[in-house]
Swiss-Prot record:
Originating organism: Drosophila melanogaster
Entry's family note: Belongs to the SLU7 family.
Gene that this polypeptide is encoded by: Slu7
Modified residues (Phosphoserine): S207
Keyword check for Metal-binding: yes
Disulfide bonds: none
Protein name: Pre-mRNA-splicing factor Slu7
InterPro entries: Slu7_dom, Splicing_factor_SLU7
Modification Phosphotyrosine occurs at: Y216
Start-end of Low complexity biased regions: 441-456, 470-480
Pfam families: Slu7
Length: 574
């Protein structure tokens, strides 16, 4: 939309009706007039025709839309204008720079009471309820003669929004000179008093100067120390230098969420750190403080009661729920006590229940122990040391020390004989197997690794087996001979017996052959597998005669690397 031809507003037409004759009426624009106006508008946009000018002589941009350039009908504009779109600053000029007089108007003295004036002082500028003077013994209304000054009145009709709220309106900065002069007089009096003190006591100067430094420290409120309802927000914002912000505990964006509005972090920012070592473990504990647990217990009781047919609700009837809960707890305690008394009456043992409360059992004792500087007991009896629940100083199998008194190369043993087998018999002091090798040099260890490995990786020889072809031929020849014997009729009885014997022998030989075949298959499998897998310590039998040899330095180092940290015996001393 572009700026179009100006239309005469309705208000202008109504106002100009009286000036025009009755015969003159506003003419309707013809098609030719609309075409000319359109051509003029296009020419102004193209720059071939001069732009329209407002009442102040400024050009109007032809590209301004019509809904902006056209003034509303109630504005009363006669020609093209943009005045309705610009702020009118001349109307906003007020009396900020003009100093309206304040206080009493001393130029005029009033001696008689006027109607509608203040009944107390006689000023016409305020009423009795707004009078700031003390109540007079004889009010101005009833006094014969008065002396009063009226106050200066500000013309509020010409006061705008800012002037009405200007606290420094009609303030004279020269009045501040009186305050400065008053302070100067006080300082001069202080200097005179100090000079008199110095004359009387010259040594008082040092103590006075030392005291002046901390003279007003107690009167100043340090940040974070004053507790006031109006200042709690500022105190809450303070934080000591050593304190670390919650959102700086863990800079990982996927860690615990920090809510900046409430300044809270519920979850633990470092869940991997143990709770006893963590400085900050989240603020979830606050959710379970106060009456939270009691509220949760009441809610649970309400649900259970509603499930059993009692019409009660925590939010709708809190008082009823509380009374029901108290009654339930009382009946529960009565039932427990009645059950207890019934059991005591039946089985006895009431004297064991008559014990003083736990708070008095360990609160105070008559035992007195006095120690010397070296830690020895001078007076009293020393408290017995806490003993283990396990048997102590029990020596078995001729040992003079307990199991675990000796440790070497990651193994525990007996110190008396340096044995690493727990149920071994003590044979006196001797070096354990592999102890000297562990402390030998790396060169000797490297030299001994190859033959040791070769000896460990020896594969047991398999004895020669009987070929299966011979067994098959023997088994096939036996039934053929038995068939030939059956032909003869005179040997029928002996044939039956011999048949049974042969069948038994044949079954026995087949069982033996199956066992041998199974052994050969197992041995072939072990040959095909890697040699270290055959020597795997985890797959051997518990009571096997396994050849134990001292590990080399490389094996010990590899074992120490793979050993978990919890198995380290020196972990508790770190």
């Amino acid at each position: 939309m572009s700026s179009g031809p100006m239309r005469t507003p309705v208000s202008q037409i109504i106002l100009s009706k009286h000036d025009q004759d009755a015969e003159e009426e506003p003419k309707k624009k013809s098609r030719e007039d609309w075409r000319k106006a359109k051509e003029l508008e296009e020419a102004r946009k193209a720059g071939t025709a001069p732009a329209a000018v407002d009442e102040e002589g400024r050009d109007i941009n032809p590209h301004i839309p019509q809904y902006i350039s056209n003034a509303p009908w109630y504005y009363g504009s006669a020609g093209p204008t943009l005045k309705h779109q610009r702020p009118q600053h001349e109307d906003e000029q007020g009396q900020l720079d003009k100093r309206a007089p304040k206080g009493l108007n001393t130029a005029r003295i009033i001696t008689k009471f006027r109607k509608g004036a203040c009944e107390n002082c006689g000023a016409v500028t305020h009423k009795r309820k707004d009078c700031l003077e003390r109540p007079r013994k004889v009010q101005a209304k009833y006094a014969e003669s008065i002396v009063v000054h009226d106050e200066h009145l500000v013309n509020e009709a010409a006061v705008n929004y800012d002037e009405k709220r200007d606290r420094w309106s009609s303030y004279d900065p020269a009045n501040h000179r009186e305050i400065i002069e008053e302070y100067e007089k006080v300082e001069e009096a202080k200097r005179q008093l100090k000079a008199e003190k110095l004359k009387n006591d010259p040594d008082a100067e040092i103590s006075d100067e030392e005291g002046n430094e901390d003279k007003y420290v107690d009167e100043v409120d340090m940040p974070g120390t004053k507790v006031d309802s109006k200042q709690r927000i500022t105190v809450r914002n303070l934080r000591i230098r050593e304190d670390t912000a919650k959102y700086l505990r863990n800079l990982d964006p996927n860690s615990a969420y920090y809510d900046p509005k409430t300044r809270s972090m519920r979850d633990n920012p470092n869940p991997a750190v143990p709770e006893e070592e963590a400085e900050f473990a989240g603020e979830n504990f606050v959710r379970f403080s106060g009456d939270t647990t009691a509220q949760a217990t009441a809610q649970l009781f309400a649900w259970e009661a509603h499930g059993k047919g009692v019409d009660v609700h925590l939010l709708a009837e809190p008082t009823k729920l509380e009374l029901l809960q108290k009654e339930y707890e009382q009946k529960k305690e009565q039932f427990k006590s009645s059950t207890k008394t019934h059991i005591v009456e039946k089985y006895g043992g009431e004297e064991h229940l008559q014990v003083p409360p736990k708070s008095l059992l360990l609160a105070q004792t008559e035992e007195y122990i006095e120690y010397s500087r070296s830690g020895k007991v001078i007076k009293g009896v020393e408290k017995p040391k806490a003993r283990s629940i396990y048997e102590e100083d029990v020596y078995i199998n001729n040992h003079t020390t307990v199991w675990g008194s000796f440790w070497n190369a990651g193994r525990w043993g007996y110190k008396c004989c340096k044995s690493f087998i727990k149920n071994s018999y003590c044979v006196g002091m001797q070096e354990p197997e592999g102890y000297s090798e562990h402390h030998s040099t790396s060169s000797t260890a490297a030299a001994t690794t190859e033959p040791a490995a070769q000896s460990q990786f020896k594969v047991p020889e398999v004895p020669p087996e009987r070929p299966t072809s011979e067994v098959d031929s023997a088994s096939s020849s036996e039934p053929s001979s038995s068939e030939e014997e059956e032909v003869k009729p005179e040997k029928k009885k002996t044939k039956k017996k011999s048949k049974k014997r042969e069948k038994k022998k044949k079954a026995k030989e087949q069982r033996k052959q199956k066992g041998k075949n199974k052994e050969t298959k197992d041995k072939d499998k072990t040959k095909e597998k890697d040699i270290p897998e055959e020597l795997d310590d985890r797959k051997r039998a518990y009571n096997s005669m396994y050849d134990v040899k001292a590990p080399t330095e490389d094996e010990i180092e590899e074992w120490k690397k793979k050993r978990p940290r919890a198995e380290d015996p020196m972990l508790q001393f770190m």
